[in-house]
């Protein structure tokens, strides 16, 4: 099993290109199931999760071709041969559940295994089921699979979600594009990935309004056609690499970065003593003189502070001056990186959904273990500024969400290498 060796060194300087958004691409790919015409995605990230979604779509009979070194995905669902998403593929990645809505809308039936992915809490499917049932779907759980059918087709409805779930919003919006009549989704998630999905669906002929707000209205159409769509910049990769110069010092330009994707995160960086400036090519990040200042962080749905940057932010605050409090309100059990950071000398106390971080002057390198995708990169960031060597094991998580992480950090001066296991 591979590991990554990080040696603490000085400031980082240079440029890092930001890839297309993993979470957007994993939503856009199942949209091909809604049409019998080709869908092409450009600016696709090159990640293991994308390969998993490719295998899933191919198992349903879709054609998926990876072009231009994986940056372009050409897909066609002209001849679907199955409506069953098997456990062997779905167990590897939670986003597999996003084939449920599209298959139900186009085929009138779908059988989807309960999903897998990172071990960060229950993350139930209840909200997805409630949303699709509101459109007239009949869904039951048998033998670990969701069996869904809509023999008379889906019908538009007004539905208010109990929680602004990103995945449930995506599933319902895709399903509603082919439903009869008008669907109004209230308390919808507002994430940029949903805005990107709607832009793609609109290019395919869908009639949708309100993306980026808490109320989305979809007027169902008889069919969708093909389209070409550019995947939005990955705001989580962007935020992650913004933290590299914040932790190590120096000045790094993030190519393709956009402030509107990371607003609440940038506010916390500013409060901690980090400067972020827009450039012609993206965003430039540098740390003001001295140690960063402690800040309190509460994770919230967009446009609040993203849960997917909480672990990386904790790595920064481990060496802040003062005491920081991080409150996790999106997922349970998402402080599994805290004990590993403690092995490096961090002072962290976790009580339920709250972590208290008392800053120390410097962390010390140590062998640590990645427990999930974002935890793995937080340990790498911590190691960049730690004294000595940090060996991060179980980095297979990393390949699910970051392309060429070693090369990108090396390019700005980090001392980092991947060790094959």
Swiss-Prot record:
Task: Tell me the residue numbers annotated for binding phosphoenolpyruvate.
Answer: 22-23
Q: Which residues carry this modification: 2-(S-cysteinyl)pyruvic acid O-phosphothioketal?
A: 118
| Chief location of this protein within or outside the cell | cytoplasm
Single Gene Ontology BP term? regulation of cell shape
* Swiss-Prot/TrEMBL catalytic activity: phosphoenolpyruvate + UDP-N-acetyl-alpha-D-glucosamine = UDP-N-acetyl-3-O-(1-carboxyvinyl)-alpha-D-glucosamine + phosphate
Q: One GO CC term of this entry?
A: cytoplasm
Q: Detail the disulphide connectivity of this chain as listed in its UniProt entry.
A: none
Instruction: Please give the organism.
Output: Ruegeria pomeroyi (strain ATCC 700808 / DSM 15171 / DSS-3)
Q: Please state what the protein is called.
A: UDP-N-acetylglucosamine 1-carboxyvinyltransferase
Give the enzyme's main class according to its UniProt record, as a single word: transferase
What are the UniProt keywords, alphabetically? Answer: Cell cycle, Cell division, Cell shape, Cell wall biogenesis/degradation, Cytoplasm, Peptidoglycan synthesis, Plasmid, Pyruvate, Transferase
Q: What does this protein do?
A: Cell wall formation. Adds enolpyruvyl to UDP-N-acetylglucosamine.
> Which domain of life, per UniProt?
Bacteria
